[in-house]
Amino acid sequence: MSIQQKLWGGRFEEATDAFVEAFTASVDFDKRLASHDIRGSIAHATMLERLGLLTREELQAIVSGLEAIGAEIEAGQFPWEVSLEDVHMNIEARLTQRIGEAGKKLHTGRSRNDQVATDVRLYLRTEIDRICGMILRLQTALVDLAEREAATIMPGFTHLQVAQPVTFGHHMMAWYEMLSRDYDRLRDCRKRVNVMPLGAAALAGSSFPLDRDYTAALLDFSGPAANSLDAVSDRDFAIEFAACASLVLMHLSRFSEELILWTSAQFGFIDLPDAFCTGSSIMPQKKNPDVPELIRGKSARVFGHLFALLTLMKSQPLAYNKDNQEDKEPLFDTVDTLSGCLRAFADMMPHVRPNRSAMYASARKGYATATDLADYLVRRGTPFRDAHEIVGKAVRLGMESSRDLADIPLEELRSLSSVIGPDVYQVLTLEGSVAARSHPGGTAPDCVKRAVAAARVRLAALQGS
């Protein structure tokens, strides 16, 4: 493209170097902003007509032209040109080509600096809403599983060593709680995304009396940005979203690690559906948990995008710099990666099959009811530190003879403490242990059912909002 054909070419005498033109272009990736760019342009044009800067006929031509361009893009028929650099210039050039002189008036009172910042916020606002819906879908799957397995006993771990018995339903509700925090963070992030830069122009605002409140209302923003310099240079909202996404994926990675462990022969706690696993090219017996493994790996990718955005912004003076073009690809890939991982998990979890007998057998190993014995002694007047010492000796006694605490005869237990009576065996069963944790937030089956009921109320309210 000759320099005369560039929309900004008036000041230049020489054409842009062909390599530089390709190197600086962003249309290959920022064209995903097209629908938001068109929406922002229609709102801007509507405001210009209200001010008398466009005639009614010019506004109608611009709106119909932009809508036709949107249809072209949707149909895959739009003639994108790298020489026009980005999504904004491609759409504006096409508009002028279609409707003539009126198209040249659209950019009145506007810069690509406030235009792109507005587009990205519109895009991200939409994606946050969609991602929040995906989180609710996954949470619903977890709550369904928790309800079915409210009384299924499994070992709880600390340091990956058997610690105390819990229920599988309680474990699923722990995952649910992590995702609830993720949902709330994203909704809070959306508040700061939902601020309109349009009207800030290049950096100093516009000499036209733009009605920014009116434009913000048309675009469903909470209001216009308060400072024009900040409006065009701010990418905090993108960084904050990447941080929120990183936390979601950190949680999904933790879930994945547990699923991977639980499907192994060494645990055998669950079976994943074949549709979410693959085999080996050499080992016929293998059923590999590829989906959770890949989600665990993809979390690192999004963590990298967060640091890329932080590093991108850390040395930039006010206001806009070309560096900011590099915010799109990490942001877009963060959205895509998070969306894919949430969908995979939500599709997979309804089909997870727990192996109840394997979980129960594992919970009987590792002296999981030792704390219950200590609590029993405390209730009979033994100071906790003394009770801890006594139970430690009981565990050693069991280890030396390969017996569980529940299998040690009463006489031997009484040799460690005279307050131990025949009723001790009620607290040494796995069922008794989990049933004893009946306070709010506990692992008792009744507590899990109450947590499930509360979660369903919350999910119904959020899905209906």
From Swiss-Prot:
Pfam family, one: ASL_C2
Pathway stated in the Swiss-Prot or TrEMBL entry: Amino-acid biosynthesis; L-arginine biosynthesis; L-arginine from L-ornithine and carbamoyl phosphate: step 3/3
Main location (coarse class): cytoplasm
Leading EC class: lyase
Keyword Amino-acid biosynthesis: yes
Paired cysteines (S-S): none
Family membership: Belongs to the lyase 1 family. Argininosuccinate lyase subfamily.
Catalytic function, reaction form: 2-(N(omega)-L-arginino)succinate = fumarate + L-arginine
Cited InterPro entries: Arg_succ_lyase_C, Argininosuccinate_lyase, Fumarase/histidase_N, Fumarate_lyase_CS, Fumarate_lyase_fam, Fumarate_lyase_N, L-Aspartase-like
Cellular compartment(s): Cytoplasm
A Gene Ontology BP annotation from the UniProt entry: arginine biosynthetic process via ornithine
UniProt-listed CDD domains: Argininosuccinate_lyase
Enzyme Commission no: 4.3.2.1
Listed GO MF terms: argininosuccinate lyase activity
Official protein name in the record: Argininosuccinate lyase
Keywords: Amino-acid biosynthesis, Arginine biosynthesis, Cytoplasm, Lyase
Gene name of the encoded protein: argH
Origin species: Methylococcus capsulatus (strain ATCC 33009 / NCIMB 11132 / Bath)
GO cellular component: cytosol
